[in-house]
Amino acid sequence: SVGFKAGVKDYKLTYYTPDYQTKDTDILAAFRVTPQPGVPPEEAGAAVAAESSTGTWTTVWTDGLTSLDRYKGRCYHIEPVAGEESQFIAYVAYPLDLFEEGSVTNMFTSIVGNVFGFKALRALRLEDLRIPNAYVKTFQGPPHGIQVERDKLNKYGRPLLGCTIKPKLGLSAKNYGRAVYECLRGGLDFTKDDENVNSQPFMRWRDRFLFCAEALYKAQAETGEIKGHYLNATAGTCEEMIKRAVFARELGVPIVMHDYLTGGFTANTSLAHYCRDNGLLLHIHRAMHAVIDRQKNHGMHFRVLAKALRLSGGDHIHSGTVVGKLEGEREITLGFVDLLRDDFVEKDRSRGIYFTQDWVSLPGVLPVASGGIHVWHMPALTEIFGDDSVLQFGGGTLGHPWGNAPGAVANRVALEACVQARNEGRDLASEGNQIIREASKWSPELAAACEVWKE
């Protein structure tokens, strides 16, 4: 007789192990599982563990050539989701040996590569990942991190201010550079290429880089502050992307930008390594994230994409506003903002954090609040995000009735007023509007902005 029993397998026999003690080196995942009617949660959870690690649908003779116990993923705990019918959180532990060192790409291919189309599941969402210290240490992480960025820019004790140049498509390079100059001269720290500004017929990348560099040197000379413009290096090939980053470095600018989800983690990690080697800061835009993270019961939560970015590398990342035009619940957002900035984050289910995460001194990432925010939001933003953040006002700068530079002045005055008020011990949550009103008495630019965007 054959040495193994052929036939289709019951996953839960092998892959559901409720008494498993997780190891410090395991990668842990929390999945929100919605099984098909009639499929027990243990079977569904086990199926996820199997399908995202060593499993295949039937017994194969080559199983005898390896030690399943050493390499298999294990579903070690299942809990029902409160208030949801037939939804469960399945916790899966993966042995570290299943993953290539320093590759976010491989980590995702393994954990979420195949299993989301699985027939026994109606829906599946990856809510959180615990990356073990041993695996974190195989990544370079952000090119510079929060402290080094502050030192490079010589800006301390306040959030940084940015602005996306609009209209995002259609300006010539020279006019684009002019818009950049106006904003920076008015008092912003950064301006930004829109995520879909790459190298189109109306404005080729090299021309844009040149005029933006000219704009920021001029603004630096006039204001005595260090200025930056996020030059979008995203391109159709990795080689072209690096070529753009090299040109940015040759121009002597401080920062470049990348769309990390559309560009891909492999490209992003290459760019992050280049940026560290060459002293460039790296701003990350999350274009395409909502395709992955918007559905509540299927896909991947943004906190997982944020953790992945910290491993892959980036100094800034867009992370929702809590107050503007795009959705994002406050506690949940603050949860992944901490995951980006802090060195050690405690498990806290009320903030969506399923696992305690130790980043073992990997540099932090500045969260960027951007999308539909204006001067009246400034007190709330200062309070919610604190000093280590970038506040980005696109329309909230360029929509100023007097133009870009006065729009920038209004934002800078509002920010400085909020920071000063906070440092004097005032409560931004309750006195915010009053603080802005008081400041607007001294700044006609701010007064005009307050008029345009009523509270």
From Swiss-Prot:
Q: Which residues carry this modification: N6-carboxylysine?
A: K192
Name the Enzyme Commission number(s) assigned to this protein.
4.1.1.39
Keywords (A to Z) from UniProt: Calvin cycle, Carbon dioxide fixation, Chloroplast, Disulfide bond, Lyase, Magnesium, Metal-binding, Methylation, Monooxygenase, Oxidoreductase, Photorespiration, Photosynthesis, Plastid
| Catalysed reaction, written as an equation | 2 (2R)-3-phosphoglycerate + 2 H(+) = D-ribulose 1,5-bisphosphate + CO2 + H2O; D-ribulose 1,5-bisphosphate + O2 = 2-phosphoglycolate + (2R)-3-phosphoglycerate + 2 H(+)
A Gene Ontology term for the protein's cellular component: chloroplast
Q: Does the keyword Magnesium apply?
A: yes
Superkingdom to which the source organism belongs? Eukaryota
Q: Where is the active site?
A: K166, H285
Q: Where is this site: Transition state stabilizer?
A: K325
The GO molecular function terms of this record are: magnesium ion binding; monooxygenase activity; ribulose-bisphosphate carboxylase activity
| In-chain residues carrying the UniProt-annotated modification N6,N6,N6-trimethyllysine | K5
Protein residues bound to Mg(2+): K192, D194, E195
One further remark on this entry is: The basic functional RuBisCO is composed of a large chain homodimer in a 'head-to-tail' conformation. In form I RuBisCO this homodimer is arranged in a barrel-like tetramer with the small subunits forming a tetrameric 'cap' on each end of the 'barrel'.
Show the PANTHER family listed in the entry: RIBULOSE BISPHOSPHATE CARBOXYLASE, RIBULOSE BISPHOSPHATE CARBOXYLASE LARGE CHAIN
The task this protein performs is described as: RuBisCO catalyzes two reactions: the carboxylation of D-ribulose 1,5-bisphosphate, the primary event in carbon dioxide fixation, as well as the oxidative fragmentation of the pentose substrate in the photorespiration process. Both reactions occur simultaneously and in competition at the same active site.
Q: How does it assemble?
A: Heterohexadecamer of 8 large chains and 8 small chains; disulfide-linked. The disulfide link is formed within the large subunit homodimers.
Q: What is this protein called?
A: Ribulose bisphosphate carboxylase large chain
Q: Which organism is it from?
A: Lupinus albescens (Lupine)
Source organism phylogeny: Eukaryota, Viridiplantae, Streptophyta, Embryophyta, Tracheophyta
